[in-house]
From Swiss-Prot:
It catalyses: prephenate + S-adenosyl-L-methionine = carboxy-S-adenosyl-L-methionine + 3-phenylpyruvate + H2O. It comes from Cronobacter sakazakii (strain ATCC BAA-894) (Enterobacter sakazakii). Gene3D superfamilies: Vaccinia Virus protein VP39. InterPro entries: CmoA, Methyltransf_25, SAM-dependent_MTases_sf. One of its GO terms (molecular function) is carboxyl- or carbamoyltransferase activity. Signal peptide: none annotated. S-adenosyl-L-methionine binds at residues 39, 64-66, 89-90, 117-118, 132, 199. Keywords: S-adenosyl-L-methionine, Transferase. This is Carboxy-S-adenosyl-L-methionine synthase. Its EC number is 2.1.3.-.
């Protein structure tokens, strides 16, 4: 069971940049449920997408896997032989807990949990790739390169699921959804101090893009088909499909 997130309930004299360290890993399930609207729905529907897109004898990549929620959702819905899930995160604390979490659930489809920068991972024979609130933490200059790499490593008919916090070109809409997200966090028990301190730590490391920017990158990578399939306030998820049929 996850501990309750109280990391920012008291004033912090020096707020550094956000890191996914042991303290965050310990409370991460509670933190993300109370901070990201629609997170549980996205996780469960990633499993539904896996049932539709994962091909026999192929690989699934969960890039930025944190504690493995998306990996487990995929594995519950893979019914083909010869498949493998590769879950990657660069946080030692997340990887250690992810391995324990994955090992607690037995299933036919093997999972390899790798501690590494997702930019170092070779994508090959992939029928599905998941970037679940991960791309926003990469240097913007590296985002197109990663999407290009994913497209090249996907099999025809394969899919990329890209979940992100969004910015908005329309400032009125952006402010409305920003405020509604803060209302959501308040309703989930976060104080103004907690919200403010966490935002200050994230603002230099989590750089968001608009849906239009994401779609433009996906097109540039080679994806002919992409669409927003889920959105709640300023959070959402896109699916991009590589053209052609699975062999």
């Amino acid at each position: 069971m996850s501990n309750r997130d109280t990391l920012f309930s008291a004033p912090i004299a020096r707020l550094g940049d956000w890191t996914f360290d042991e303290r965050v890993a310990e409370v991460f399930p509670d933190m993300i449920q109370r901070s990201v609207p629609g997170y549980s729905n996205i996780i469960s529907m990633i499993g539904m997408l896996a049932e539709r897109f994962v091909q026999p004898a192929s690989q699934v990549y969960d890039l930025g896997c944190s504690l493995g929620a998306a990996t487990l959702s995929v594995r519950r819905n893979v019914h083909h032989d010869g498949c493998k899930i590769i879950a990657v995160d660069n946080s030692p604390a997340m990887v250690e807990r992810c391995r324990r979490h994955i090992d607690a659930f037995k299933a036919q489809t093997p999972v390899e949990v790798i501690e590494d920068d997702i930019r170092n991972i070779t994508i090959e024979n992939a029928s599905m790739v998941v970037l679940n609130f991960t791309l926003q933490f990469l240097n913007p200059d590296d985002r197109q390169l990663l999407l290009n790499k994913i497209f090249q490593g996907l099999n025809p008919g394969g899919a990329l699921v890209l979940s992100e916090k969004f910015s908005f070109e329309d400032s009125v809409v952006g402010e409305l959804l920003f405020n509604m997200h803060h209302d959501f966090k308040r309703a989930n028990g976060y104080s103004e101090l907690e919200i403010s301190q966490k935002r200050s730590m994230l603002e230099n490391v989590m750089l968001t893009d608009s849906v239009e920017t994401h779609k433009a990158r996906l097109r540039k990578a080679g994806f002919e088909h992409s669409e927003l399939w889920f959105q709640c306030f300023n959070f959402g998820s896109l699916v991009a499909v590589k053209g052609g049929s699975a062999t």
